[in-house]
A protein has these predicted regions:
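Structured surface interface patches that mediate subunit assembly and partner/cofactor docking
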Residues: 2-12, 27-28, 36, 51-202
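A short, structured beta-strand-centered segment in the mid-to-C-terminal lobe
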Residues: 20-41
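A glycine-rich, hydrophobic loop/mini-helix early in the fold
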Residues: 5-21, 42
């Protein structure tokens, strides 16, 4: 892991237009070239991940985070943007139990979702119960909590990555805290996302 190179790249990106500047610099590439570029980067990341201490703090574009959290976030982003691509070309993604990583970061980001929307993060716990693609049940929190979110793992992941409007995700949301959370749920870093319109993909 070359942290010095990352810091240099981060500095260059900050003065060259950020993500939008990066996008513009690649707009002339063919789909095949873009895919090869992405694949090379993904393989480099996977190779680096094999040797990193998962508890080690890693520099990032936002606050530093543990290597484990950073890699989980990359899985979440890859899945979410993969769904964007599938939507754009009229295809669908087959859900797998690897969605547990996306769901986990979505649950862990509940407090962040409130803060980034200028709200106070609640002390109250929310129970989350999801049906995995394999039929297994995943849970977070206490089943005795007064607020809960239940449904499919796929629907929950679509909601917390804002790839579908929460009302289109087939979730059962009970309690004031859970309802408020799911209206602003955001697993990704940065300012509040614009999300998707209700019924946009129906």
């Amino acid at each position: 892991v070359d942290e010095e190179r990352f810091r240099t790249d981060r500095q260059e990106m900050s003065v060259s237009g950020g993500v939008e500047g990066l996008q513009n610099s690649h707009r002339g590439r063919s789909p095949e070239e873009l895919f090869a570029w992405w694949r090379d980067g993904a393989q480099e990341l996977a190779h680096a991940a094999l040797s990193v201490d998962l508890s080690k703090r890693c520099a990032w574009y936002g606050p530093s985070m543990s290597a484990r959290s950073m890699l989980t976030a990359r899985l979440m982003e890859t899945w979410a943007h993969g769904l964007d691509i599938a939507d754009a070309v009229g295809e669908s993604l087959t859900p797998t139990d690897r969605l547990i990583h996306v769901a986990h970061i979505g649950v862990r980001a509940m407090g962040f979702a409130f803060v980034t929307n200028g709200r106070t993060a609640p002390d109250e716990e929310v129970f989350v119960e999801l049906l995995a693609p394999s039929g297994e049940t995943w849970t977070w929190g206490s089943p005795n909590a007064s607020s809960s979110v239940r449904g499919s793992a796929y629907g929950f992941c679509c909601a917390v990555t804002q790839r579908r409007h929460v009302n289109d995700c087939g979730l059962t949301v009970t309690g004031n805290v859970a309802r408020e959370w799911m209206s602003i749920a955001q697993a990704f870093a940065g300012p509040p996302g614009s999300g998707r319109a209700e019924g946009q993909f129906s």
